[in-house]
């Protein structure tokens, strides 16, 4: 299970995130449960309020939801600012949660 990896990541984040830093994260959610992603969201938000800057590549609708974040989307070779609700990660997650059985029926039917 990935809990050992997520514990290591959490400890590193707690010990290594400082105000006024610049941080580059590439899919930090990969080893994190949704609960750990929420913890990371709180840590990032707290440091950002103190002046730290973050560039995060993510597909996580949780991390995309960091308050006051500028979200850049990559569509058809174009990079542009977009709203949280307009991200593919949000839309697919919302569709799955709100229409799980219908979506599964469509996807899993021959």
Regions found by a protein language model. Give the residues of each.
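Walker B catalytic acidic pair
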Residues: 26-28
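Single conserved hydrophobic/aromatic residue that forms the stacking wall/gate
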Residues: 1-5, 9
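Conserved alpha-helical scaffold flanking the Walker A/P-loop in AAA+ ATPase domains
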Residues: 11-16
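C-terminal lobe/lid and adjacent interdomain/linker elements of RecA-like ASCE P-loop ATPase modules
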Residues: 35-53, 60-110
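ABC ATPase nucleotide-binding domain "signature" loop
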Residues: 30-33
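Loop/turn-to-beta-strand initiation segments
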Residues: 19-22, 50-55
